[in-house]
């Protein structure tokens, strides 16, 4: 019986990237790197620093199993159990959304607005993250603003379990208060407390009518609860109503947006907010909206 070929890291990456590309897998290089890094316990950069490292038969079988899952459509981040956001590594599974690069831009915009208001230089700015999911926004804010006190709210107890795990991993658990609360509930403001210097939210904003148009792997694997609202605007409306009582005067409200949502969300804000700004993503689509409480 012929011996199994001994694969090096670089050979296996090259072959897998080409195979994934042939099979029309999104981001074939990223998929191959994340899966192989997961199997070997290496960061993506380390794969290339240790490119001649041979794989054991056990490692090769584990990598093949991971590739089979990817070919079936399961997102690579769920297979590897990790995703990167703003340069930080987060644990993810099907209980939470996979962090997106567009959300990094919204977070950066929120921090810029907070800095412009002067509130980021306070001894301990108070921040509320509504719909925290994996905790990537709340935890990144805690890491970037070491004096910040953060409240992270989500309606999903399962999502909060993931967020707590990530907060523990990044050493910020003592500065983040996790709250199970529904932003659509009249009791939401009482549940989360306040007042806050920054309220940031990436709420469910996909209208029910658009659900069938999303990528199949999103519909099959990512939590619908975190993505969809009947018209796409219910959470914006509820948060906009609650925000004046949650934010200090001059406090910043920052939303991630549906690409077509800026005008409607602006209308929902009413007269309680000033200096409304809309920011665009890498594709020049409206992606974030921020304003200040009056």
Curated annotation (Swiss-Prot):
Q: Which organism is it from?
A: Chlorobaculum tepidum (strain ATCC 49652 / DSM 12025 / NBRC 103806 / TLS)
Which keywords accompany this UniProt record? Methyltransferase, S-adenosyl-L-methionine, Transferase
Q: What class of enzyme is it?
A: transferase
Chain residues that bind S-adenosyl-L-methionine: 131-135, 154, 202
Q: What is its EC number?
A: 2.1.1.297
The record's comment on protein family reads: Belongs to the protein N5-glutamine methyltransferase family. PrmC subfamily.
Reaction equation(s) it catalyzes = L-glutaminyl-[peptide chain release factor] + S-adenosyl-L-methionine = N(5)-methyl-L-glutaminyl-[peptide chain release factor] + S-adenosyl-L-homocysteine + H(+)
**Which amino acids does the record list as binding substrate?**
202-205
Q: What is this protein called?
A: Release factor glutamine methyltransferase
**GO MF annotation list:** nucleic acid binding; protein-(glutamine-N5) methyltransferase activity; protein-glutamine N-methyltransferase activity
Q: What is the lineage of its organism?
A: Bacteria, Pseudomonadati, Chlorobiota, Chlorobiia, Chlorobiales
The reply on keyword Transferase is yes
- Please cite one Gene Ontology biological process associated with this protein: methylation
What Gene3D superfamilies does the entry give?
DNA helicase RuvA subunit, C-terminal domain, Vaccinia Virus protein VP39
Instruction: Give the function comment from the record.
Output: Methylates the class 1 translation termination release factors RF1/PrfA and RF2/PrfB on the glutamine residue of the universally conserved GGQ motif.
One Pfam family from the UniProt entry? MTS
